[in-house]
């Protein structure tokens, strides 16, 4: 059986989350959580929250052994971009793009 968790509109660039997401793909859940715990990136904290949620969702399925779960799919998609204006000198303005991410984690039994 598999369980999934999705976090939408996370306020971090997908490019930054994908750096961390590649490290946990295919790993057992305990090992993946340890990797995320000791990775000094903002994306690691967000991924660990989604991974904990996926494990909690798997616990709700009858007959699933939580200790034998492994990370099957980690998908980071681009969400909508928030446009903001940064005032500059001499009446100019620069556009700031605040990027968002949709993070999907799927865990399954080994």
Curated annotation (Swiss-Prot):
GO terms for cellular component: cytosolic large ribosomal subunit. Keywords: Ribonucleoprotein, Ribosomal protein, RNA-binding, rRNA-binding. Pfam families: Ribosomal_L22. This is Large ribosomal subunit protein uL22. NCBIfam families: rplV_bact. It comes from Maridesulfovibrio salexigens (strain ATCC 14822 / DSM 2638 / NCIMB 8403 / VKM B-1763). This protein binds specifically to 23S rRNA; its binding is stimulated by other ribosomal proteins, e.g. L4, L17, and L20. It is important during the early stages of 50S assembly. It makes multiple contacts with different domains of the 23S rRNA in the assembled 50S subunit and ribosome. The globular domain of the protein is located near the polypeptide exit tunnel on the outside of the subunit, while an extended beta-hairpin is found that lines the wall of the exit tunnel in the center of the 70S ribosome. InterPro entries: Ribosomal_uL22, Ribosomal_uL22_bac/chlpt-type, Ribosomal_uL22_bac/org-type, Ribosomal_uL22_CS, Ribosomal_uL22_sf. GO terms for molecular function: rRNA binding; structural constituent of ribosome. Belongs to the universal ribosomal protein uL22 family. PANTHER family: CHLOROPLAST 50S RIBOSOMAL PROTEIN L22-RELATED, LARGE RIBOSOMAL SUBUNIT PROTEIN UL22M. One of its GO terms (biological process) is translation. Part of the 50S ribosomal subunit.
